[in-house]
Amino acid sequence: MDVILLERVEKLGQMGQVVKVKPGFARNFLLPQKKALRATKENLAYFETQKARLEARNLELRKEAEQVAGSMGNVSVVITRQSGETGQLYGSVSSRDIADALAEKQIQVERRQVAIDQPIKTLGLFPVRIVLHPEVFVTITVNVARSADEAELQAQRGGMVTGLREEDEEEEVEETATEEGGEETAA
């Protein structure tokens, strides 16, 4: 089925292009979301008359998305979940969980704007794309941990913390403090 794209669609094409897609994709996604029109003579003529208005609307939406992207900066969200000793979660973190965590930080995004290929099933730090507009996206860091304390440790170390007891953590902190002190005197 041939359709006329009314906005940029990732991995498909730019606004105004006539592209061939599978009928189910057109009927179930592109047409209901008003991202495309069927490529008929009447719709081609309609698109040409409305092209300037559509481009202006697209530009306005893009500017709004860029402002939101600028305000998001380096956002990081913490999601606490129960897990086994190896770091495997007893469930998963989905796009809905990430959208809810962003909503707690007063950032409103829909779950369909959170672009993760597969649900997150382990503890750790994960980069996640938030698609604010077909041409504007922001990458945030999702910190999945067992507790808030563990989330802080993961953020400091830049990775998953597994099986550390409090005594081990204190010893590591003391060791790094002495190493840093030794480097300063040598310099």
Curated annotation (Swiss-Prot):
One of its GO terms (cellular component) is ribonucleoprotein complex. Keywords: Ribonucleoprotein, Ribosomal protein, RNA-binding, rRNA-binding. One of its GO terms (molecular function) is rRNA binding. Residues 166-187 have a biased composition (Acidic residues). Residues 155-187 are annotated as: Disordered. One of its GO terms (biological process) is translation. SUPFAM superfamilies: L9 N-domain-like (SSF55658), Ribosomal protein L9 C-domain (SSF55653). HAMAP family: Ribosomal_bL9. Belongs to the bacterial ribosomal protein bL9 family. Binds to the 23S rRNA. This is Large ribosomal subunit protein bL9. The gene is rplI.
